[in-house]
Amino acid sequence: MASLKLVNINKIYPNGAHAVHDFNLDIKDGEFIVMVGPSGCGKSTTLRMIAGLESISSGDLILDGERVNKLAPVDRDVAMVFQNYALYYNMSVHDNIGISLKIKHEQKNPIHNSILETSKKFDLVDYLNRLPANLSGGQRQRVALCRTVVRNPRVFLMDEPLSNLDAKLREKTRSEIVSLQRELKTTTIYVTHDQIEAMTMADRIVIMNNGYIMQVGTPTELYDKPDNLFVAGFIGTPNMNFIKCIVDGTSLHIKDEIIPIAVSHQEILKPYDGKEVILGIRPEHIDMSEEIYNLHKAALTLPIDYYEYLGKEYYVKLRLYDDIITARLDSRYDVSKE
């Protein structure tokens, strides 16, 4: 287990591309951090700098109080799981799991015992003599994870380890990783482009875009109190609806539509009176029930553009002038009759 601090970390390539800008993050001992963002945002580059696979252009990487910028990857005592498993296909599962221990010149019997004990956590005991080519994708990923755990490193680094798995297996492996991390209490940094993985796995999430940190916080903090439009639009499925409107005293004007502002928000919006603002509405906060209408006395009558039936709920696309907004409605509403 280890604490990790990244101070003003930058990555600038020889061609001038600035991949990571002034990255600052303090990671507690045993914390599960997930870095998430669109492709090319700098999350994997940051992970590789922590691992020592990429040089740091400027800034300080502090591991347990020691500056490790120039320390070789093998001396950092961190273990990395890659998206493509990175297994040796000419070696058995047993030898793949134990390769890092063998490199450390540990004794043969202790190595075998460690492999056996760790493989039990991943249900791999019956596959130790097989070659990776004879395993399913999920089993190969478990071998890669097992190989990481058997090292007992100070930090786990995981670069999109579930992206090659199907949806059902991804969900199962996701919960296994979380359970294992809580059991081992090993500091973990996990990179993904999948916000569901981020929301369900992380103690804290780091959202990145274009090489910058956009916000750091718990899943609840990011969902309920996004710092900016990027975070608000990135977190949540379906995406948050953004509607341009004008503040007019105690009301919001969306072209010819008028929505009363809740008393609790009137003071907050007072400085914006007469100005254009962006109203953000989560799809699940749009409702069709009379009870909600009677409670708030605010409603819009909007035509349905189309809808998607998902069993327990509908994603309903509503037309608001030139915009399409999404409502997430319980399937007890028969929108096909609306």
What are these regions (language model features)?
Residues 36-38:
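The feature captures the beta-strand-to-loop junction immediately N-terminal to the Walker
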Residues 51:
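Helix-to-loop junction immediately C-terminal to a conserved catalytic motif
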Residues 57-60, 210:
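Conserved coupling/switch loops of ABC nucleotide-binding domains, chiefly the family-specific signature
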Residues 59-67:
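Conserved ABC transporter NBD signature motif
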Residues 75-79, 83-230:
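ABC ATPase nucleotide-binding domains
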Residues 249-338:
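Non-catalytic connector elements of ABC transporters
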